Amino acid sequence: MPAAIYDGDRKYEGKIRIPAVSITDAPRFPHRGAMMDVGRNFLPKEEVLKFLDLMAFYKLNKFHFHLTDDQGWRIEIKKYPKLTEIGSYRKQTQIGHSDYYFPRRYDGKEKRGYYTQEEIKEIVKYASDRFITVIPEIEMPGHASAALASYPELSLSLIHISEPTR
């Protein structure tokens, strides 16, 4: 087999001819996707690109990019700079779930990070070069604590959120 097959080179388009053998490789489903939740746990751009390479290797074609949630806002919006100044940061993360019998526990580690508009463009192009469509997700109106911590004037007057949910 040509080495390019193992390097992720897509020029063969799933069709390779071997003497006396014909292999046709085609996906069964038109929508083959994976989701990455960077809203809750930020990952650097390089990790996202590695994930896209892995998706391409397995012929996945839809990348659900979960960019916001209560725990963090991960995409730069120049008109609303507080979304990344405040919303991309949290003091610590809750470990597991809590209830009456099990009090809340936290890891004590600060979390911070977001993607600039240029980085988002680079990710989209990188995905497109691998025949992957990026489906960005921005949570609204639910799961919006990071946005409301950044712009509390947008929330109900009865609710005050000082930082993204831990």
Regions found by a protein language model. Give the residues of each.
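Feature activates predominantly on carbohydrate-active enzymes
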Residues: M1-L158, S162
